[in-house]
Amino acid sequence: MAKAKFERNKPHVNVGTIGHVDHGKTTLTAAISHVLAKTYGGEAKDFSQIDNAPEERERGITINTSHIEYDTPTRHYAHVDCPGHADYVKNMITGAAQMDGAILVVASTDGPMPQTREHILLSRQVGVPFIIVFMNKCDMVDDAELLELVEMEVRELLSEYDFPGDDLPVIQGSALKALEGEPEWEAKIIELAEALDSYIPEPERDIDKPFLMPIEDVFSISGRGTVVTGRVERGIVRVGDEVEIVGIRTTTKTTCTGVEMFRKLLDEGRAGENCGILLRGTKRDDVERGQVLSKPGSINPHTTFESEVYVLSKEEGGRHTPFFKGYRPQFYFRTTDVTGTIELPEGVEMVMPGDNIKMVVTLICPIAMDEGLRFAIREGGRTVGAGVVAKIIA
């Protein structure tokens, strides 16, 4: 069967549902799918199709996630929903499903619960830029004052984690009633969709960001100079552009004198392409795998950062035993392993396989990094954890 052609005529935005267990994330996902399909066209997905999330592997970690798509008049959305709390933690830390914005689902019958807080904290740590709140099960609360209290509580909680709690959209609705086709509650789903359209800005495309290419290999071509190869992560590099070589050693500047792809000479290399870049006056020994080539000033090398880490369970092929402070694994960034030491939060003595934890990492040599960069933790080439740079310290 031929796949439907992917129409790229609308901006594409990635979103997802987050929130406490049983607050109605999957029901809301189904309600959005149904109401928007009914209103704007498209295919509706049922609760059971979404809830039966297929198992995926991302960097060796088993994650269950459901992906659905829907349209509003101006945008195309890809929406991710996870069945279990552990799946959310893994998903957000590995960046398996990068979110341009999240819909925080809070049952108005319960108010914010422990996982509500944890998902907000994770969103802050992994750099989810925007949150919209959907207060669910409002059909079960008769008291308008109670709804107001829950809304205040959620807004305060978001402000506590540096989200603009006072200004972000909060929609009071009932996912189940909307799914059952009751017009007053369907209207709330449309209101939510309008909030997604207006509150989450259109994401910047990779190609519009400053140029960056992780260096995978280095060759010297006699009579031409040194060529570095890799896949362009973002931006565009053109022949004649000044570039920096960042990470591991002192940052140096050079000029791109040629771009090659599949043995053909090109004028430029773009995000997503594997290419070779010829560097002016750079010696073979001046560059190595693990460094990055970037637009001057766009990224800096760092050694110390706060991170949010998920430690693989034994079943996922991770460690069988906990680790303690003083643990010195390798941290794999983009194309290379760098040894580092860890500092655990106060009062935490050990970390068990299957845990997620905030830790401060100090690398033995600097690596080009931004907040939001993903990494793997490895021991002798085997992945034992996944993490994300939450905050750069030095």
From Swiss-Prot:
Query: Residue ranges of region G1?
Result: 19-26
Chain spans, region G4:
136-139
InterPro entries, per the entry: EF-Tu_GTP-bd, EF-Tu_GTPase, EFTu-like_2, EFTU_2, G_TR_CS, P-loop_NTPase, Small_GTP-bd, T_Tr_GTP-bd_dom
- Keyword Protein biosynthesis listed? The answer is yes
User: Which positions does UniProt annotate for Mg(2+) binding?
Assistant: T26
HAMAP family from the entry?
EF_Tu_B
Under what name is this protein listed? Elongation factor Tu 2
Native species: Shewanella sp. (strain MR-7)
